[in-house]
Each structure stands twice: as structure tokens, then as C-alpha cells.
Amino acid sequence: DITVEWAKEAVKLGQENDSTSLSNIEKALGYYQHWMTYRDKYGLSHPSISLTAVAIAMLSSDFQHYSDEFNHPSLLTSKYGPFYSDEEDISAGEVNPIDNWMSEKDDIDKYIEAHPDAAAYSFESTHPLTQDEWEKDVDFWNDKPVYIGHYTSMIKPDANYVGLAGNEYEIQPMMNNADSMDEIIFNPINGIDFNSYQNLVQSYLKDVKQEDKINTLKANVDTANQNLVAAQNAVKSAQN
């Protein structure tokens, strides 16, 4: 078992800017859906949601406003203590994180322009992209002057259980928002298909919003009653 020592300070459960807020949990649903549009282009499967991975992604995202360095928590354990070791992508700023990670493909395209033979390792030479082909292409690019680790993570064929999260904290001066995608293979995975997860989130959001509406209505009725009593008292005073 891992005890994430900084979690209580970094994560502000349910607060507006936190990765655990309802609005940011809902935002992460959109990240997943956008990601799948890219995976569809490569003929790839849609990973299931891991509730464990979602929790890790929330921790990793919120870590970025707690730490004095934008980095993976698993790479800063000597300073901040243990964290989960998994496949992780992090992003910061106003840009959609999925687009940000996928944009690394530009490095491949530019390299192929100068070295046409490299097109055989473009991750697009076969469709659908297979795990064997993906691994072969990854090996080819390992010693090339490209930065594509997030891109290859996004299009990994055998990614089976994932979680996404994001917050709206200030990460660095003039830079807000941190996002994370985590893929895990260790237990407990707590897997659920995306549609079921989305339904759970949206059902909960609906209940909360309905409760907010009821509370607002009650408050309005109370205010109206108070105003009515005040008006009646004013009339009585005027009559006296």
C-alpha cells in the first residue's frame, strides 16, 4: 500500500478549482470523448475507465499546484514521498490536454519530410494499428531527435484501463489548469465501461443540481414570505 503524504494538503475535496469538483469531473468526461476521436482514426479500441486510475489522475493533477516543480509525482518521490508508478501524461495551460499530447506527432511528420524512409514507422502504415506495430515504431523513434512520449501513450493499442482528471488551479505564474491521464495495470483496477461511468457522473450531477434548485426555491419562498410579512406589518403600521 502507498500513502501519498501530500494528498491532504494538495487535494481540496469538492472545491471549485480542484480536480475533485463536480464541474472538473464533468470536464474530464469530455477529455475522454475527445481522445476517442483520435483513437478511432487509428482503428483502436476504447479503454475502460478505472476508478483507481481516475483517483490517481486527480492526485497527479492537484499535485502540480502543490509542488514547486511541474513534473510527475512518481519522479519526485525523494522530495515528496511515494506515489503510484504507471503510464502517465500530464499537461498544463488552457489548451485541451488531448490535443496537446497528440500534437507531438508533428515531430514525426517533420522528421519524415527530411527522411522519407521513416514513413514506414509513422504509426499509420497499418490500419488498425496493432500492438506489435506500435512497439516496432516506438523502438524506431527511441534514438531519433523527437519528443513523442505523450503521443505514443495516446495511441497505445493495448491501453485497457485509464483515468483522466483536471483542475483549474494556478500552476505557475500566468498559467492555470493541470490535467492528467493515467493508465494502470495493477489491482485494484475497479474498471467500468465509459458509458456506465458517464451515466453515473451525470446522474449524480443531475441529483445535485436538482437539490440546488429545490434549495434555491425554498430560499426564494422563505424570502417571499418574509417580504410578505414585512409588507403586512408596514400596512398595519400605516393604518395605525
Positions of PLM-derived features:
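Short, well-ordered surface patches within globular domains
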Residues: 1-86, 151, 156-168
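Intrinsically disordered, low-complexity segments enriched in Ser/Pro/Gly/Ala and basic residues
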Residues: 59, 73, 77, 121-124, ...
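A well-ordered secondary-structure block
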Residues: 78-185
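Non-catalytic cell-wall polysaccharide-engagement segments
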Residues: 166-213
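Long, non-membrane, amphipathic alpha-helices that form coiled-coils
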Residues: 197-240
